[in-house]
Regions:
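N-terminal secretory/targeting leader peptides
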Residues: 23-122, 131, 139-332
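Conserved glycine-rich "GG(E/T)P / GGGxP" loop and the immediately following alpha-helix
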Residues: 136
Length: 332
């Protein structure tokens, strides 16, 4: 009788354990997954608008099962710090310029060489075609998942003391650049002194004279308030540097294949919202800084600037990367 009682007791415990395990598995499947996305720009900036659209679509496509919290204005660190955190799984996503990202994947230099793209249409045909997809896929080797590209317009120089009309006007000027060998080489090729520093330090450095200028697009010149302390904006459009939305491979490996697929779809589907937002923001930013009294000029001869930067193609690119540049140029 005692043996029968013990057997029955063990059976009850075993059955209870099975039910508890089943309930635990159900809870895990039903549990909301919360992921984090970092961006160094303010809330109303076009890239953050793209980030938020991506987050909205992830939640929609997953029927609310996956949420993406967007942390803007460098709450989780500057671009380089966020890239490193994504690489090691500390942050799940970040939107960054491919300029600092090229330190982790040098092949990305092929997408951001000076005067490479004829116009925005050429840029998007490249990025949304086979070439762009190849470079997104290439991010896996660095422990990232490349999701999509966002717009960042064309970059030009802005300075505190004088406008830039010719290459010689840049000689000896200390110009802030992103932490990128290519951008340092680009500024050096024009006779200026490249000064890498984090984006958040640029305003005070312009104000105090630590640097004489920087280079960026209309929205950044406006949203950062750099136009308040660097009144001369000289349009040379020396490069178009795409933004990339990347995911941590470590984070994505924890998800099902179906969830990764819907995240990739959400990223692609968020792109047009970001592009449209960029166009609108850029137009308003240019109007705003002109109204604020900034001195806007075009350089005298773009060919002079292009010729000065041309040696970068040989010094910065491998034969493989140069082959990609030729493919980019061939896109019609």
């Amino acid at each position: 009788m005692k043996k029968i009682f013990i057997v029955l007791l063990l059976s009850v415990i075993l059955i209870a354990g099975v039910f508890a395990q089943a309930e635990g598995e159900t809870a895990t499947k039903d549990q909301t997954i919360v992921l984090r996305l970092a961006d160094n720009q303010p809330d109303n900036y076009p890239t953050v608008i793209g980030d938020k659209k991506f987050a909205e679509l992830v939640e929609k496509y997953s029927n609310g099962r996956i949420k993406v919290d967007v942390y803007s204005q460098a709450q989780l660190g500057d671009e380089k710090s966020c890239i490193e955190q994504v690489q090691f799984g500390g942050i799940d996503f970040t939107r960054v310029s491919i300029s600092p990202l090229s330190s982790f994947n040098p092949h990305l230099n092929a997408l951001q060489m000076p005067y490479l793209y004829r116009d925005p249409d050429h840029l998007w045909k490249v990025l949304n075609g086979e070439i762009g997809q190849y470079f997104l896929d290439s991010m896996k080797a660095s422990n990232f998942i490349g999701l999509t590209y966002y717009d960042s317009g064309a970059r030009s120089f802005y300075t505190t003391k004088k406008p830039i009309y010719t290459v010689s006007d840049l000689k000896g000027l200390k110009i802030r650049v992103q932490e990128s060998d290519l951008m340092m080489g680009l500024v050096s090729s024009l006779g200026a002194v490249p000064t890498p520093m984090s984006y958040g330090d640029v305003y005070s450095s312009l104000q105090s004279g630590v640097i004489d200028g920087a280079e960026n697009n209309w929205p950044s010149y406006d949203s950062s308030s750099h136009y308040e302390v660097a009144k001369y904006y000289s349009i040379d459009q020396h490069t178009r540097v795409p933004e990339m939305l990347i995911a941590s491979k470590i984070s994505m490996d924890k998800l099902s294949a179906e969830d990764v697929a819907l995240i990739k779809k959400a990223a692609k589907d968020s792109q047009q919202v970001q592009i449209d937002s960029w166009a609108d923001y850029a137009m308003k930013s240019e109007a705003k800084v002109r109204e604020a009294g900034c001195k806007i000029n075009k350089i005298n001869d773009q060919a002079e600037f292009a010729a000065a930067m041309a040696p970068l193609y040989d010094s910065m690119l491998s034969d493989e990367d140069m082959a990609w540049v030729e493919k980019i140029r061939a896109v019609k």
